[in-house]
Regions:
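Short amphipathic alpha-helix adjacent to the substrate-entry channel of hydrolases
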Residues: 1-13
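Short beta-strand/loop motif that positions the catalytic acidic residue
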Residues: 131, 136-143
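Short beta-to-alpha linker loops that shape the active-site pocket of alpha/beta-hydrolase fold enzymes
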Residues: 12, 17-21, 80, 174
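C-terminal catalytic histidine-bearing segment of alpha/beta-hydrolase fold enzymes
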Residues: 145, 149-197
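Alpha/beta-hydrolase active-site loop
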Residues: 22-43
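Primarily recognizes the serine-hydrolase "nucleophile elbow" in alpha/beta-hydrolase
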Residues: 41, 46-98
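The serine-hydrolase catalytic nucleophile loop
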Residues: 1-2, 18, 149
Length: 197
């Protein structure tokens, strides 16, 4: 719904598949090339509004932290913010054993190294707060796949402590799906407002 509403307002919606790279440095490099192509070859704005759903939370945050000057805002929808939570399943969530192995491989980490890793979206938010990148999350309070307490709540607490701006819409009784909102106006307004700053 959000994408369609933005298209109706004249925005471009673009996608670069890196889901199976889990926001790893390889994914960031691929997005760097994609960004350069869009800006240089097609004249796109130099600041992008980033949108990530579920595992997309990993790349939107990790790319933004590597490129804060290129980001107008971040919209995360049921975002994975710590790979130990999903796909790792090291907290309250179920995780996904096969996907966890693929995640470790994408990062070149052992399981022990992954437990000490400090390059998840929940880490190093200072660079985004310093750049005044506004954040917006939509979460289902009953999400058992990507538990809110291990993901979005951690970002919210840490970002506010850093003086960053974050808005969160909580959907009571809703799990990981459906994504977005029946009426995407709050999300669209956030993106439009942030792009004018």
């Amino acid at each position: 719904q959000t994408d369609l509403a933005l298209l109706e307002k004249g925005w471009h919606v673009v996608y670069c598949e890196v889901g199976n790279l889990f926001g790893s440095p390889k994914a960031v490099v691929r997005w760097d090339a994609f960004y350069a192509y869009l800006v240089k070859e097609h004249g796109f704005a130099k600041k992008a509004a980033l949108e990530g759903m579920s595992r997309g939370g990993l790349i939107i945050y990790n790319w933004a932290k590597a490129n804060p000057e290129k980001v107008s805002c971040i919209y995360g929808d049921a975002p994975v913010c710590d790979f130990k939570s999903w796909p790792g399943g090291k907290g309250k969530g179920k995780g996904s054993a096969g996907t966890w192995k693929n995640c470790l491989k994408a990062y070149g980490l052992t399981e022990k190294e992954a437990m000490d890793f400090k390059g998840n979206p929940i880490d190093g938010l200072e660079v985004l707060a310093k750049a005044k990148v506004p954040l917006f999350h939509v979460i289902g309070e009953a999400d058992t796949v990507v538990p809110v307490a291990e993901n979005s709540d951690v970002i919210e607490k840490r970002y506010e402590e850093l003086g960053g701006s974050i808005e969160v819409i909580r959907k009571p009784g809703i799990g990981h799906h459906p994504h977005s909102l029946k009426d995407p106006k709050p999300i669209v307004d956030f993106v439009l407002r942030s792009s004018k700053q």
